[in-house]
Every structure is written in structure tokens, then in C-alpha cells.
């Protein structure tokens, strides 16, 4: 693929993720949009890593590191959402203020 196509795809994924993160009222949807943003960043990392020096795997290794951190973030985020849903019976962001108990 050409560099412009990959960058356009990455920018498109990033903008969809930002839009979804800003407009989302559901916590699970917000977590999914955050994962979409991280995947767009990973696509850029791998693309530029192969563009500048395809023999070194710095971008690929950093991308695997970001994927690992994103998996941990998703697990912790879903555990928090599950706990909030158990206590509040809702996963809406505006109803999740736990300080108003």
C-alpha cells in the first residue's frame, strides 16, 4: 500500500475514535473508541517504522508494547464498568459519579 493510503486510513480511524469518545454516553462505547484511537496510533508506528528503516523493528516492538498496555487498560476499564453497573444499574457516563452517594 502507498504511504498516503495508510496515513489516510489511520487519520480516519483516529478521527472516528475521537468523535466517538467525545459524543459517547456509554462507558463501553467510550472504551471501544479509545481502543480505536490506540490502533490508529499503532498503524502509524508500524507504517513509519517500515518506511524509514525496514530492517529494525523498533516501531513493531513499540506497537506490541502499546497493544499490551491497551489490553491491560481494557481489562481494568471493563472491570470498573462492571462494578459501576453492579452498583448503579447503568453504564451511562453521566450517571457514574460515585462521589454523590
Swiss-Prot record:
Keywords: Chloroplast, Membrane, NAD, NADP, Plastid, Plastoquinone, Quinone, Thylakoid, Translocase, Transmembrane, Transmembrane helix, Transport
Gene Ontology MF terms: oxidoreductase activity, acting on NAD(P)H, quinone or similar compound as acceptor; quinone binding
Transmembrane segments: 2-22, 32-52, 61-81
Top-rank EC class of the record's enzyme: translocase
Pfam families: Oxidored_q2
Protein name, UniProt field: NAD(P)H-quinone oxidoreductase subunit 4L, chloroplastic
Superkingdom per UniProt: Eukaryota
Gene Ontology cellular component list: chloroplast thylakoid membrane; NADH dehydrogenase complex
Keyword hit for Translocase: yes
Organism annotation: Piper cenocladum (Ant piper)
Gene Ontology biological process terms, A to Z: ATP synthesis coupled electron transport; photosynthesis, light reaction
Protein's membrane topology: Multi-pass membrane protein
Annotated gene: ndhE
Subunit structure: NDH is composed of at least 16 different subunits, 5 of which are encoded in the nucleus.
Amino acid at each position: 500500500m502507498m504511504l498516503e493510503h495508510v496515513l489516510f486510513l489511520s487519520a480516519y480511524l483516529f478521527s472516528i475514535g475521537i468523535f466517538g469518545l467525545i459524543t459517547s454516553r456509554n462507558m463501553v462505547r467510550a472504551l471501544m473508541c479509545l481502543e480505536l484511537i490506540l490502533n490508529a496510533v499503532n498503524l502509524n508506528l508500524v507504517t513509519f517504522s517500515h518506511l524509514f528503516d525496514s530492517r529494525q523493528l523498533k516501531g513493531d516492538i513499540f506497537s506490541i508494547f502499546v497493544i499490551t498496555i491497551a489490553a491491560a487498560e481494557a481489562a481494568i476499564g471493563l472491570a470498573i464498568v462492571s462494578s459501576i453497573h453492579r452498583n448503579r444499574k447503568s453504564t451511562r457516563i453521566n450517571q457514574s459519579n460515585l462521589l454523590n452517594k
